[in-house]
Amino acid sequence: MNEYYQPSEIEAQAQKYWEENKSFNVTEDPTKEKFYCLAMFPYPSGRLHMGHVRNYTISDVISRFHRMQGKNVLHPMGWDAFGLPAENAAIKNNTAPAKWTYSNTDYMRKQLTELGFGFDWSREVTTCKPDYYKWEQWFFTRLYEKGLAYKKVASVNWCPNDQTVLANEQVVDGQCWRCDTAVERKEIPQWFIRITDYAEELLADLDKLPNWPEQVKTMQRNWIGKSQGVEMRFDLANPIAGTTGFDVYTTRPDTLMGVTYVSLAAEHPIAKALAETNPALAAFIQECKVQSVAEADMANMEKKGIDTGIKAKHPITGDEVSVWVANYVLMDYGSGAVMAVPAHDQRDWEFAKKYDLEIKQVIAPEDGSDIDLTKEAFVDKGVLVNSGEYDGLNFNAAFEAISQTLQAANKGKVTTNFRLRDWGVSRQRYWGSPIPIFNLPDGGVIPVPADRLPVLLPEDVQMDGVQSPIKADKEWCKAELNGQAVEHETDTFDTFMESSWYYARYTSPNADSMLDPDKANYWLPVDQYVGGIEHAILHLLYARFFHKLMRDEGLVECDEPFERLLCQGMVLKDGTKMSKSKGNTVDPEDLIKTYGADTVRLFSMFAAPPEQSLEWTDSGVEGAFRFLKKLWKAVASHLEAGSAGEIDANSLDEQQKALRRKTHETISKVSDDYGRRQTFNTAIAAVMELLNEITRSADRSTPNGLAVEREALEAATLLLAPIVPHACHALWQAFGNEVAVLDAPWPTVDEAALVKDTITIVAQVNGKVRAKLDAPANADKDALEKIALADESVLKHIDGKMIRKVIVVPGKLVNIVAN
């Protein structure tokens, strides 16, 4: 072999071998244990960045490791290809989104191949292609038929810049997650899917995911937001526009006797009815429409409101309280109305302070300590005071008593509530899957029949940056059903629809149905999913929901899509996330040209544990490159020294035994690091230590010495093969192995090699270490005592003293007490 490491040549040869042998194309094989490894597919933005490289290196390392353990491994790749950035890029570059997208996927596929990722490209899915979205459309029509998809006029988050609806999760600090424009509230007809029907199961089944990060499960639990509370009726003193009252939901019925006013959301029907004759209220409602609805913002923003002048009756006392419209009340949680208890809710307290409303204490600390309501609300649970017959009750007793009073008076009931809202899937954009619905002349709707799917999105369009080309195309909108003129729905699906089921389509990408159940049930669930924690709520919750919908359609059998989840950290440079705007990006292509793909892979796995952020350093990349050159050189010089035979374990000297022990200790550690712990950085460090040991203590003067070195170098090659596959492919061949390293079995630990003939024990005199001694590993207490008492350093420290006792801890120490 060439004594110098030449990555470009080595990597081209390995990639050619994998391509010619279709090394990563797999089929179902019931005789083998399957392993489905998946990294979140990329948006085809045009070029890979270091975040992609890290993400896909992790999944590739895991895939190759499990393959070497004899499993049937599926590791597919595709493109999350619909979405707004393609529209924006098309406008900017004066091209069609489809053309821009396909040219990007071609370029990025080449980049992924150059990095040596072992993807089964025969299963590639591209979500903007009709053979993919046809089945999404078909599935939506099935959901519609089951009553799980519906249309209603809804108040939505509207991005005036992107001219589209945003999910609550896509509003960050009151701004669009994509373009940072201030988000407004707007009412338009929208399509929804009833994710709330599955809220209970989505919550409960998080307990079936022991191999998910606790943080992700907590985020989902909080997002689903199950709570137990009381729904109660506040009657209006005088009816408004035919409405006699409104419902309020609270998790704190124990504070009901402290209600001093009630607040309605700006979008509440009563508020809207009053606004028709109240210009000040109408203006205030308009102002509320452009404020953030993100929880964090609502907690911190200035609380504002307007007194409607009408009164509502307290459901227990019958006392009249004023009705306000307030900017901190959300229409889509509970019922869009809250009972205000300023003494025991901080938002109500801030509002009451601003508008000089009564603050009435009804809860006192259980320990009898004082509270100061002039400074802030007392929000903890405690004991009821100033609450008539309920005084002295704690939270649980008050919850029970007050809810029973309300129930008996037909004014309320105990209910379970969820923060989770139904998923709004309509988008007023062009580059997405058309929603498969016909709008009828009478205003009704009907799903497009299955034999007329897919509803094709025209790809050869001109983008004007103002209106969706399909909305503007009157011919496209026109259709006919049973001789009647109908119109195509011009909204498209939220792109989270595509990413909610792509993992399942990979199992049968060419099926003439949504999934082939036999293939899907062989491969699913995904055994290992890899992706960023920023997808904890949206994508991961929607995918879990979609999986349950597919299960209930009889397409899959398992309850959950992803068995184990690894959320990789970000790639930083100069302490901040790499981004074009900050000018701190590193181009993977330049690195591959300079150092080769293996160096890039090695550095990105070695620099930090996978869940932590990785700080990019040029010196770290140089270090990874140096290590590969050192490994290459070690193998080349070993092979030059002659051919190695079998190890004769019975005639090894101490040095050879030590190197063998180090080899098998490394195999044991690295196997655990790859499999159970998934700490690839410590696996690499262990192989580096082994290589240091080889260069330090290899003995080529005897056949046994050469054989022990060969075993160590072959082990190092196998252990690094998942991380630096090109170099290891070439090294494994150089050792004369017929089978490619990709298909070589993972090395096993020889337990006999781990056994030590001798051990080091500590000799102490009066508790102070005086010597470190070698002793036979099987020496008993008497033998260890004799060895310690024969050592010169020990003798020197007990000379002239009387030995009172000798304490022996086998395998560790001998302590002589003398005075």
UniProtKB/Swiss-Prot annotation:
It is an enzyme of class 6 (ligase). The keyword Ligase applies. GO terms for molecular function: aminoacyl-tRNA deacylase activity; ATP binding; leucine-tRNA ligase activity. It comes from the Bacteria. Pfam families: Anticodon_1, tRNA-synt_1, tRNA-synt_1_2, tRNA-synt_1g. ATP binds at K580. CDD domains: Anticodon_Ia_Leu_BEm, LeuRS_core. A motif ('HIGH' region) lies at residues 42-52. Keywords: Aminoacyl-tRNA synthetase, ATP-binding, Cytoplasm, Ligase, Nucleotide-binding, Protein biosynthesis. One of its GO terms (cellular component) is cytosol. A motif ('KMSKS' region) lies at residues 577-581. It catalyses: tRNA(Leu) + L-leucine + ATP = L-leucyl-tRNA(Leu) + AMP + diphosphate. Belongs to the class-I aminoacyl-tRNA synthetase family. This is Leucine--tRNA ligase. The gene is leuS.
